[in-house]
């Protein structure tokens, strides 16, 4: 009887212990000089798919740090289609106009379920008109992490595009020819996925530091020609505006912040996406310089405008879950107080602490806002999905002051409505609406209204804004829907706050 067998006899609770075999019995790759370092490398995406064990019915995930420049999602799904896979759940952190190619793979049954923060373009139009049998699950950035945490969403294989990686899988978005900046979305997928496949443009020597995605999270690595075009990050919702009306609204929003009571040394802010929201930053600069007020941190999607304020000493730290332009990506690489954070750290309501809980002020956009301050950023005036939840309801719930910026009308279509088509963020989370026709304050915040009126700002009742909009456009014709549900709007805690129904075809 050997030593291990004696242990089994004398200590029954140790019966699972095994006798020593060889130094490399559990790590055979260490006995192979080539496999020791290159065992994760795959010659093609197809090889990585096979090694990762993708099967019909599984869930695959992607990140959208490259936004409209992404080349990974379409490439991988097209390959999976050619390989014959069916009934897959697509769990991308978001989908863009560039993902219209997915339509054919939904029609053919390759993709049968989708979890995403949002969608745009022909893909969104097709789904809004009933393309899928299963409704799309629309979640917030923080809410996505909670779905993963709670086990409703389980990623089998994550395909994550990165500019550079070493042969063990240490990767970041701040080096290489196609820098996208923060990999805050991908960090979550790398943590939760059963298998992680990196698609990288460049293989660099070990160790590739700093690493956003680390070697103990990564299973396989494929070098590809391109994962994305960083020049297309700052288009669409992340574009920079020169529109006079949007700039005027941005200036009004900066005035609201200045006189809100929260504009004081050490305040914190997030400026969100949307042209007027991001433009607000440039107007905050002059107010901060004039008053000597410096911010403790800015959070969320980071823009070049926020980087300018940081480098001028007006914002102490930048907490970055997504870079909205090349200037922000470059800053993340060189500025030690420009810090990358995951969407879990950013806004997960189920985490032990979400950074958004520390926010004083947030500026957000809206497709519609109703007289009860409920906000829609998902569906357009035609009922078609054309936006994203993003971090909207996350930061609106957490910030001390939530400001929505929007024009009163868009192409003669009212933004202020009686009731939003789709409710994403509840009115109880919205404090102020800033439009080109005046500023409305939620009645639940009388102290804010009083401060703004004392400052001489144009304060109006939100019902008056609605009446003004209707007087200019008339009452819009109601959108006709069928009974089929094509989208489920999940609040950040996972609950259902609304649904999207199929748009009825015109006869």
Q: Where in this protein do the model-derived segments appear?
A:
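Conserved alpha/beta enzyme-core scaffold
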Residues: 1-507
